[in-house]
Amino acid sequence: MSHTAEIPMVPGSESPLELKPLKAVDPKAVYHRRAQRLLSLAKDSPLADYFELCRRVVAIQARLAAEADFGQLLAWGKDEAIPLSHLGSEADSYWQGLLQQLLSDLLPQVGEDLARVLRLLMQQSPEQLTSWGASLRQGHMSAVPARFSLFIWAAMGVYWSHWAPMVIKRIDQRKVAQQNLCPICGSHPVASVIVDQPRAGLRYLHCSLCESEWHYIRAHCTSCGQDKGTTLWSFDDTQAQVRIESCDECHGYTKMMFVEKSPLMDVVADDLATLMLDSELNAKGFGATTVNPLLLAHETEQ
């Protein structure tokens, strides 16, 4: 029978000399792996149809990441905090172009009900899309019609993830302080990723928009930063591949993906596949402090 187990936590002593504050990823590889993982997880999921829709969206993201025109990297200062958080109208033009390509590719692959949604989104004005995109990036999910959010975020993700590695190469990582939002684009993390390189047990937060990863000390709440009152929870066994860290101070939680135990894991897909953990923590009075780009369409409109 399934159960939730509380796991004792031992704070680690990590030296910044042994790690990179920021890790860039190859978006093409990330999207390809995510699509494969969604295909695998769908086989045993009650959300198989939704997993398949997400897989198709992510597969298109992979193609766009490899083939699309992204223009030139927009101007930003090397000492600028969160450099990709306030790009101008030129960025809006490019990601909206990516959105049109994504919708055009997806349209022949879906049923008529969803096709009507896609066609309606394709007809929106650039000004409306700009407003919705800004609302999503600022965390105001209810300001955007839920049926459109998944696709808008997917297009923005392709654009921001293309430029993030180039920005990471150019900034002075020694100036990157520990923070709960992405140091590159300012978005929320999807979850924590526990890695075994450069040494076992290091934690990185994975960005929900630009796919960058940034180091965050273990046993500190990833939302409020407190190092007291954090608890690690597991489902079924204390060595599970996916666990949850909760905070008694802010009553938030974030999932932790132990990728060294399962190299095929993808932070977005496996977060989607473990919604039962969210239900367990919600029942205990905790709320998620993270964002999954494949769950944005499920945000409640107000």
Curated annotation (Swiss-Prot):
InterPro entries: FdhE-like_sf, FdhE_C, FdhE_central, FdhE_N, Formate_DH_accessory. Keywords: Cytoplasm. GO terms for molecular function: ferric iron binding. This is Protein FdhE homolog. CDD domains: FdhE. It comes from Shewanella oneidensis (strain ATCC 700550 / JCM 31522 / CIP 106686 / LMG 19005 / NCIMB 14063 / MR-1). Necessary for formate dehydrogenase activity. GO terms for biological process: protein maturation. Belongs to the FdhE family. SUPFAM superfamilies: FdhE-like. It is found in: Cytoplasm. PANTHER family: PROTEIN FDHE. GO terms for cellular component: cytosol.
